Curated annotation (Swiss-Prot):
SUPFAM superfamilies named in the record: Heme-dependent peroxidases (SSF48113)
Protein name: Cytochrome c peroxidase, mitochondrial
Localisation: Mitochondrion matrix; Mitochondrion intermembrane space
Keywords: Heme, Iron, Metal-binding, Mitochondrion, Oxidoreductase, Peroxidase, Transit peptide
Positions annotated as active site in the UniProt record: H123 (proton acceptor), W263 (tryptophan radical intermediate)
Binding site for heme b: H247
Gene Ontology biological-process entries: cellular response to oxidative stress; cellular response to reactive oxygen species; hydrogen peroxide catabolic process; response to reactive oxygen species
Amino acid sequence: MATFAPHISKITKSSTKFNYGRIAKTFLGVAGSAAIATYFYNNGNPFNNNNNNNNNNGGSKNAAKALFGASAGANVKIAKVPEGKSASDYQKVYNDIATKISENLEFDENAGYYGQLLRLAWHTSGTYDKSDNSGGSYGGTMIFAPEEFDPENAGLQVGREFLMEFLVKYPWISRGDLWTLGGVAAVQESGGPKIEWRPGRVDDNTASKVPPNGRLPDASKDGKYVKDLFARMGFNERETVALLGAHVLGRCHKHNSGYDGPWGPSFNQFTNVFYTTLLGDWHVKKWDGKKQYEDDETGEFMMLPTDMALKEESYFLKYVKMYADDQDLFFKDFAKAFSKLISNGIKYPADSKPILFKTLDEQDEE
């Protein structure tokens, strides 16, 4: 396969900027990863959150039809912020999540919880279908079948359990808000861009709005599949490539997805390394798992078939090269696309303003 970028050993040149800050400082002081508390969900009302009611929001169906088409009338999603809650309340939740992340940096072979939390936010949002405004992050439905048992969600109970204590501590926050906020914290605390986030998701505790399985990305597919799947959510090719840059964080596990390994050396730092690594030389890995690719130079990194599709299709490749050359541009595009992903289908009040959370490092410097 042709090489379009420097070899992996050279990816730390000026196109990639690492921001270690609190991550490195905290890691040096970590003696071991803390135990993960185990919680159990039920199919009724896990927490009687003030924000977890199932209001019909009378009169909103016509607005939804105007926004999303006639078929969206049954899938009205009006943001409703718990009474008396403001940006400062959500910043406290962010701080608690970020602190817990920083206390568990050795988790998963030093990958930490960044990839887990980003994947949870991504997958709870990635079921959205713009044709009828169904799915997405609004209802926090991943605790219900069949979504909970979607093969593409295997392993995400770890991320949900990581965040569970904050549903207890902050009973007014919805699952949808907490899970997406966790993804924002993962990106920002690992050195990534600021993500605009808005509260107001309302939990579905009746399991009446659970999306069908099959909407999340199947990593074994080709470029056309990737293009069509992201188009279903309302994304163009550029946004698609930007969103898949999330693979820079974390790693795959054979016992969950059938794939194994990190995508590159930056698995606990949000950078553009996914793209520079992807543009190297690869071969199909010889092993007993699903088809995946292994880098020629080190044999330590992996790519999924859907990742490789980004360099095989010209309508994706130009953006891969663009982001490999310009991390600042990638950050800008990712921030915009990810904010769109986690908010898809939700109608916010006209006076609703996005929240930009301060990182722990920024607060330390104040």
